[in-house]
Structure formats: structure tokens, C-alpha cells
Regions:
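NAD(P)+-binding Rossmann beta1-loop-alpha1 motif at the extreme N-terminus of oxidoreductases
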Residues: 1-57, 61, 65, 190-192, ...
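NAD(P)-dependent Rossmann-like dehydrogenase/reductase catalytic/cofactor-binding core
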Residues: 2-5, 204-287
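Rossmann-like NAD(P)(H) cofactor-binding subdomain of soluble oxidoreductases
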Residues: 21-23, 36, 42-45, 49, ...
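Small-residue helix-packing motif on alpha-helices
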Residues: 35, 60, 75, 195-202, ...
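Glycine-rich beta-alpha junction loops
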Residues: 39-42, 96-99, 119-123, 171, ...
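Internal alpha-helical scaffold of NAD(P)-dependent oxidoreductase catalytic cores
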Residues: 103-113, 129-167, 177-216, 261
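Catalytic, metal-anchored helix/loop core of enzyme active sites in primary metabolism
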Residues: 170, 182, 285
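Aromatic-residue-lined binding/catalytic grooves and analogous aromatic/hydrophobic interfacial grooves
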Residues: 174
Length: 287
């Protein structure tokens, strides 16, 4: 099966990522996937308005594709709850930061198809950038369906799972870097005498325009940057200051720090999960 039409999609966790995915898929005109949502409280909220809510157990039995959108520290407990209710052919699609496909496969049993996805909060506006990696038992058909579903909320590409920690350093949190640039440059514009709203609006449009120019032209960002620069002009003067303050090195270090922290969080999540499982096993009543 390579088309999501008629597919049962159950989203476990209705936070910003989960609810945005559910709405995007449910409202897509391309296919008529059946979308259900579970929440921790079981109660509807503004984020789940217009969506069908079910219990975790009910959702597990009805899912062709189970989207796991929980916090890392809550994921092990959810899987323990739904593991026995999932059908053998249900594909588990994880949006959980730091947890690998191997971690899910070990928790859910041999042969379970698992797909791991990194995305961005821009999926709220249908502008997300998602990267999907298949586990040991995910087939090309599984990946095709997942990518089709993800295109309802932005773009989606496949990549080896080894790339995903690095992806999180430039894409997962990458939009925050652009927010920071707009924030600081707005302050700089105000310092130079511009009204704050005007400075911010101009910079937002500059960011949108730059993104569209890179996408539409296919040219290297350095080439596009050089198009803006004129000999002895304002932009060259600005970039001399950026180089003097080693902004390039700071960005390299920021991405490296995010990558390293992602690996630390993944290791800690796996350790916490093993400790929790060990404690539960020790506290289990004898049969």
C-alpha cells in the first residue's frame, strides 16, 4: 500500500506537533485517511477541536499507522500500555526526540515496522520540514505512505537514521536561529531610528523572500548573497563586521552544541527507560 487513502491514522499525544499533524492529515484533499487522536486526559481541548478522540487502547487496535507524539519521558509508559493492543502490521511512526528506531523495536517486539521522524513546529502552518528514517522492518511502501502524510504539513525527505541527530541541530531547532536573527536585527533597526513594527515587518518579509529565492533559483546561498553586495556598499560593510565578530564560527559551534546535546538526551532517555523497566520488573507481583 503506497497511498494513505482509507488508512487508519491514530495520533498518540495532542500537543503542538500531534494536533498539527492530525489536523493537517484530516483536512488534506488528496486522500481520505481516517484520523483519530488520543490525549493524556482523554478530554477535548482547543487543539483537538474537530478531531475524533479515542482511548489509547482503542486507538491502538484501530491504527494502521500509530503516530507517537509524546514527550520522551512519557513514551515508554505509553508503549507499555498499547503494545499488546497494536496489530502485528501496525506501523509505528515516532516524532519523539532522541529515541531511535532500535529503541522502539526492542520495546514493541520483533518485526515491528518503525519510522522515526524529525520535524519542525512550522507544521502548524503547513510549512514544516520533516526528515523520515525507516527502521529495520520499515518497507518502501511504509516510507511512501509516511512521506505522503507528512507532505500535508510541509515537505518531507528520507534520510539514514544516523543523520537525524545532526538534522535536529540545523532543522529541528533551526527556525529558532532565524527567529533570533529577526529579533536582534529588529532591535538594531530600532537603535538606528526605525519604529519597531516597521523594522520587524521588513525583516520578516526579507526572511520569506530569501527563502523563496533560494528555493526557486536553486543557486548556492553564497551566490545569492554576492548578488546583493556591491563594491564598497552597505552590505559589504555589514559583512565585514559579521566576520570581525566571528559569527560564522559561532554558528558552527551552535549547530555542533545542538548535535551533541541531542546525543546526550538520547542516551539519557534510553538509560531512564531501562531503569524504569528494571524497577517495574522488580516491583511486579510474583505469579
Amino acid at each position: 500500500m503506497t497511498s494513505p487513502s482509507g488508512t487508519g491514522i491514530v495520533v498518540f499525544g495532542a500537543g503542538r506537533i500531534g494536533s498539527s499533524l492530525a489536523h493537517g492529515i484530516a483536512e488534506a484533499d488528496e486522500f481520505d485517511a481516517h484520523v483519530l487522536v488520543t490525549t493524556r486526559s482523554g478530554a477535548p481541548s482547543a487543539r483537538t477541536e474537530g478531531l475524533s478522540l479515542v482511548s489509547n487502547a482503542d486507538g491502538a487496535t484501530r491504527a494502521d499507522y500509530a503516530f507517537i507524539c509524546t514527550k520522551p519521558q512519557d513514551t515508554a509508559a505509553l508503549l507499555d500500555e498499547i503494545r499488546d493492543d497494536l496489530r502485528p502490521d501496525t506501523v509505528v511512526v515516532s516524532f519523539v526526540s532522541g529515541l531511535t528506531t532500535q529503541w522502539f523495536e526492542a520495546r514493541l517486539g520483533a518485526g515491528r515496522p518503525v519510522v522515526r521522524v524529525m520535524t519542525t513546529l512550522a507544521i502548524e502552518l503547513g510549512c514544516g520540514a520533516s526528515v523520515a528514517a525507516g527502521g529495520a522492518h520499515a518497507t518502501p511502501d511504509h516510507m511512501s505512505v509516511v512521506n505522503s502524510l507528512l507532505t500535508t504539513v510541509g515537505t518531507s525527505v528520507e534520510a539514514p537514521e544516523d543523520y537525524l541527530d545532526a538534522v535536529s541541530g540545523i532543522s529541528g531547532g533551526g527556525i529558532a536561529y532565524f527567529y533570533f536573527l529577526v529579533e536582534v536585527m529588529t532591535q538594531a533597526g530600532v537603535k538606528e531610528g526605525l519604529p519597531v513594527d516597521l523594522a520587524r515587518d521588513l525583516l520578516i518579509q526579507a526572511a520569506v523572500g530569501a527563502g523563496e529565492m533560494m528555493r526557486a533559483s536553486g543557486r548556492h546561498p553564497a551566490q545569492l548573497r554576492e548578488d546583493v553586495m556591491s563594491r564598497g556598499g552597505q552590505t559589504i560593510a555589514a559583512f565585514r563586521e559579521l566576520e570581525r565578530h566571528n559569527v560564522r564560527d559561532a554558528l558552527f559551534d551552535a549547530v555542533a552544541a545542538a548535535h551533541a546535546r541531542g546525543r546526550e538526551l538520547a542516551s539519557q532517555s534510553e538509560l531512564d527507560s531501562r531503569q524504569s523497566k528494571s524497577t517495574n520488573d522488580e516491583n511486579a507481583e510474583p505469579v
